């Protein structure tokens, strides 16, 4: 979710001004939601397709173990007999058009010849659009360049008229973005992801289940590897859902079953519950690795597609301006919390922490969310920083290791 989306919270004003109209008119229909007592049992048609990080999900731990077993088997087949090689994780945050920064950084990193082959790649919102191509490597950088230097608002959404916005499920129609996703997310792409998944590499995308109000991590490698006819559609739906800003963009309805009974879950932008994620602290990677004899060097590279310094502005005394500014502040603060949680988890587990973000001196202004006159220079800035050797921050914003050392 970006900090600059001027129409994002118009829905709130509509709800305040027209309660009688809204309550008296039909809304889009849906299949019944999963009853609260069965949410943990609900499954899409593809096994092992997702995890619930806030529930200490044992399936997530089991997937980590399987990943290690597959990696060891692949290394052995290739003649590797020494210790496990370093594991490098990549996490890509939300940010709308600001995703051009991350796309440029990855492209520049490729040009240096030093970009790692990531063991784990995760993405939220715009990061979910980048993640599959980052996972597959530099060969797919041209897609990132095209997407984040040529895409405009009309390639992502169409604004609905006022009445449609009031009585439908969002202010805008994301049919254009669905076409973009269909263009790039193909069966061929899934086959390439499946090959890497078989080597023990993991690709995860985050959404938010709005019915149960919890984050969901989707195991995109397992989905890609599935022979289920619905695999391609589910992969596309998850990608679209991760970027579905609540109120602005329509939610994505995902079919699940409980004891053979069909239900639907409403999924929206993963940034509603996480701006960026690595793995849940409950996994305790350090302890698990020791138990499995899998001690190795690990590092995480976090791309936060946002500025981290205060974005000063003189706020007009207008309802929508105030709402937008306040909620943008909440999103920024949530992002800080995510970065701190990841730092604490990484420190506990012996994972080297590295953070990139849009620099303070990038001052180009945008006129819309996907403004190519903003995204192109942002892409080039990220690329140039990577080529020069990005100065990765070793700590989250506001953290002073000297102060931490003084705590008794």
What residue ranges belong to the model's regions?
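Patatin-like phospholipase
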Residues: 26-119, 135-408
């Amino acid at each position: 979710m970006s900090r600059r989306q001027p129409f994002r919270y118009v829905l709130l004003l509509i709800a305040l001004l027209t309660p009688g109209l809204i309550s008296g008119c039909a809304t889009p229909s849906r299949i019944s939601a999963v009853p609260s007592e069965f949410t943990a049992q609900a499954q899409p048609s593809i096994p092992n397709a997702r995890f619930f990080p806030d529930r200490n999900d044992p399936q997530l731990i089991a997937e980590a173990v399987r990943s290690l077993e597959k990696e060891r088997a692949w290394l052995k087949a290739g003649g590797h007999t020494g210790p496990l090689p370093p594991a490098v994780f990549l996490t890509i945050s939300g940010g709308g058009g600001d995703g051009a920064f991350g796309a440029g950084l990855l492209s520049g990193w490729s040009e240096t010849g030093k970009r790692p082959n990531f063991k784990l790649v995760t993405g939220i919102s715009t990061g979910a659009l980048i993640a599959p191509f980052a996972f597959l490597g530099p060969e797919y950088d041209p897609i990132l360049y095209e997407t984040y230097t040529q895409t405009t608002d009309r390639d992502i959404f169409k604004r609905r008229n006022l009445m449609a916005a009031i009585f439908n499920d969002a202010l805008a129609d994301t049919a254009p973005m669905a076409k973009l996703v269909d263009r790039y997310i193909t069966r061929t792409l899934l086959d390439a992801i499946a090959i890497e998944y078989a080597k023990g590499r993991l690709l995860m995308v985050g959404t938010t289940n709005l019915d149960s109000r919890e984050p969901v991590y989707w195991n995109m490698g397992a989905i890609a590897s599935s022979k289920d006819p619905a695999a391609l559609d589910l992969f596309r739906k998850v990608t679209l859902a991760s970027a579905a800003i609540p109120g602005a963009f329509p939610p994505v309805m995902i079919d699940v079953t409980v004891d053979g009974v069909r239900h639907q879950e409403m999924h929206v932008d993963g940034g509603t519950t996480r701006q960026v994620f690595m793995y849940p602290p409950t996994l305790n990677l350090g302890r698990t690795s020791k138990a499995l004899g899998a001690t190795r060097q690990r590092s995480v590279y976090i791309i936060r597609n946002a500025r981290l310094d205060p974005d000063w502005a003189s706020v007009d005394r207008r309802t929508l301006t105030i709402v937008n500014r306040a909620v943008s502040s909440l999103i920024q603060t949530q992002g800080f919390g995510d970065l701190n949680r990841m730092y604490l988890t990484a420190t506990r587990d012996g994972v080297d922490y590295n953070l990139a973000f849009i620099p303070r001196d990038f001052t180009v202004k945008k006129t819309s969310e996907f403004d190519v006159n903003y995204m192109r220079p942002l892409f080039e800035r990220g690329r140039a920083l990577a080529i020069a050797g990005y100065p990765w921050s070793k700590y989250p914003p506001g953290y002073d290791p000297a102060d931490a050392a003084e705590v008794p």
